Design a protein with these regions (language model features):
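Terminal alpha-helical segments
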Residues: 1-133
């Protein structure tokens, strides 16, 4: 089980790493890692909403929680209990990151522009603060 504190720390570290990749012109990698920032923030928020001390990690821990075993940001937002708030108050940021999925790792380098990567990382940073303060 990953504790809420560990989830928050992981999101923070991924955001720092994504910003570093962005500064180094590694735009595709920045977005790929930036998506995990949002995923972790959503999972921490979900734990808070459900009053869980942590989020399942192993197959055994997920045994009774298969619907929570996802990287789909839309699903995680719905499960987090703050979908209406996020989509109402942060629609631009949400639309910017909502397309993300781990399959982006297969994109060819150079697919993402600097401007798009910067917008994504900025949106991920805002959502991390909102979801997991």
């Amino acid at each position: 089980m990953m504790t809420r504190a560990q989830i928050k720390q992981t999101a923070h570290q991924h955001l720092s790493d994504a910003r570093l990749l962005l500064r180094q012109g590694r735009h595709d990698g920045a977005i790929y890692l930036g998506g995990y920032v949002v995923e972790m923030a959503l999972k921490e928020r979900l734990c808070r909403t459900l009053r869980w001390s942590g989020f399942p990690q192993t197959a055994k821990e997920f045994a009774n929680f298969q619907s929570f075993k996802t990287h789909n940001l839309e699903v995680l937002l719905t499960l987090s209990g703050v979908e209406t708030h996020v989509k109402l108050h942060y629609p631009t940021q949400w639309r910017t990151v909502a397309f993300w999925n781990p399959e982006l790792r297969y994109n060819l380098p150079g697919t993402v522009s600097r401007i798009d990567a910067q917008a994504f990382i900025d949106a991920a940073a805002v959502l991390r603060r909102v979801l997991s303060p």
